[in-house]
Amino acid sequence: ANGRRWQDVDWKRNFGGENWADRRRQAIAYEDRDPAVLVVGAAQAGLMIAARLSMLGVDTLAIDREKRIGDSWRRRYHALTLHNETRVNHFPYMPFPRSWPVLIPKDMLANWFEFYAEAMELNVWTATELVAATYDESAKRWTVILKRADGSERIMHPRHVVFCNGVSTLPK
């Protein structure tokens, strides 16, 4: 992890204080900050870039309009498998298990996406859509409007927006 493995002694001694789960909830909520990078789409490309940026210490939020990470794959035709062999589809930092089939079934891959996001501690909002994005040249920041599952909207100001919404999807 190139020296990025965190060492947290505080939670071991303060049994009534915040623990890892509390800190993850706060990190994912983005209540008091904006991400440096907003990644639109949380499948292969989106999760991979979020993992790479996170390992570099870049505060990154990935969003996906699906209810669960991987649902874009779960909804596809029943017998779908990847058309490329497992060995060329590994994710950064966590290769697929050696016991996996050569051609990964869609549901297995979708479940991996969820597992990967959790294991890599990626900040992901599901059931969230990008409604609008405008770039402010003077501030060198984007203004993005995100629509959450409950219908609420959230305005954020990331420095960068990365579109990973798939080869068949066009931004609106």
Predicted segments with their positions:
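A secondary-structure boundary/capping signal
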Residues: V40-A43, R65, T126, P158
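Feature captures the FAD/FMN-dependent oxidoreductase FAD-binding
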Residues: A1-G3, L103-T169
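Conserved Rossmann-like nucleotide-cofactor binding loop
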Residues: A45, R68, S168
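N-terminal Rossmann-like FAD-binding beta1-loop-alpha1 element of flavoenzymes
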Residues: D32-A62
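Short glycine-/acidic-enriched loop or helix-start segments at secondary-structure transitions
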Residues: I49, S72, Y135, K172
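Extreme N-terminal leader/targeting segments of oxidoreductases
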Residues: A1-A36, N111, T169-K172
